[in-house]
Amino acid sequence: MSKTFQPSIVMLTIFLILVTSQRRKCDEKIVLQFCNGRNRCYEYCDTKECVAACKKKRNGEGICNGDVFSVSAQCLCLYKC
């Protein structure tokens, strides 16, 4: 394996552990938010019930600032609906 590939596996493993360990009722569900570098974010909710709540932040309002957890302050953040 290349040296750049291995750390990404570690990060993915850590992320999966964090998401699965923090599953709660819907109003506290974790939202995964990827920023594209221009303060626009792509959000992924883990339940259908949370999708509507998350769409409210999708239109450029969301900026990754590490409110709940961040691997990088500008790239990958976890938010709550």
Curated annotation (Swiss-Prot):
Residues 1-21 form the signal peptide. Keywords: Antimicrobial, Disulfide bond, Fungicide, Plant defense, Secreted, Signal. Its main location: secreted. One of its GO terms (biological process) is killing of cells of another organism. It is found in: Secreted. One of its GO terms (cellular component) is extracellular region. Pfam families: SLR1-BP. InterPro entries: DEFL. Belongs to the DEFL family. This is Putative defensin-like protein 135. It comes from Arabidopsis thaliana (Mouse-ear cress).
